[in-house]
């Protein structure tokens, strides 16, 4: 994960490391995408990372998504980019013109409506109930949002917040998508 900082050089270091890892793993060039975690960074610093080539950002806290969204959207638009969930269904999706925006931290159900107009993907969803609520709200808004479920595959009690191992996870994922 690349973390935006005051120097675009840091992004160059992340890209170089990513390309080396792709080669080492025998992956196609460009098949690995970096997500810049923007926690504690202001809009100017995030835009410096975007100007340096970052094409996917993630915020850790829902309130930070809400606080930064308007400024980021305006600055991205000035540069010809769309950010997160575009208002216009016909918004450009040409590579390099759209910046996906992820919520990478925990989400409480009372904040779903506040982040849905902005983020493309919500990571670390730790209950099927929350996933279903996200799905219902997204459908009601006519948008699609990615959801990454946190599943406790090991069954260890050390991660009680995660969804217990599900033998029919793919069937459950299809169900959530239909609500």
Predicted feature locations:
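Conserved alpha/beta-domain cores
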Residues: 1-179
């Amino acid at each position: 994960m690349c973390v935006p900082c005051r120097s675009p050089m840091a992004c160059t270091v992340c890209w170089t490391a990513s390309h080396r890892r792709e080669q080492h793993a025998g992956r196609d060039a460009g098949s690995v995408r970096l997500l810049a975690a923007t926690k504690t960074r202001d809009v100017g610093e995030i835009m410096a990372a975007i100007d340096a080539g970052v094409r996917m950002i993630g915020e850790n806290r829902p309130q930070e998504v809400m606080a930064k969204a308007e400024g980021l959207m305006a600055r991205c638009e000035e540069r010809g980019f769309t950010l997160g969930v575009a208002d216009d269904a016909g918004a450009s999706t040409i590579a390099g013109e759209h910046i996906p925006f992820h919520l990478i931290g925990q989400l409480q159900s009372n904040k779903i409506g506040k982040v849905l107009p902005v983020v493309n993907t919500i990571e670390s969803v730790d209950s099927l109930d929350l996933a279903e609520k996200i799905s219902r709200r997204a459908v009601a808004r006519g948008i699609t949002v990615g959801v990454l479920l946190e599943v406790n595959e090991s069954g260890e009690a050390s991660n009680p917040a995660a969804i217990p191992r599900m033998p029919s996870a793919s069937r459950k994922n299809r169900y959530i998508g239909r609500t």
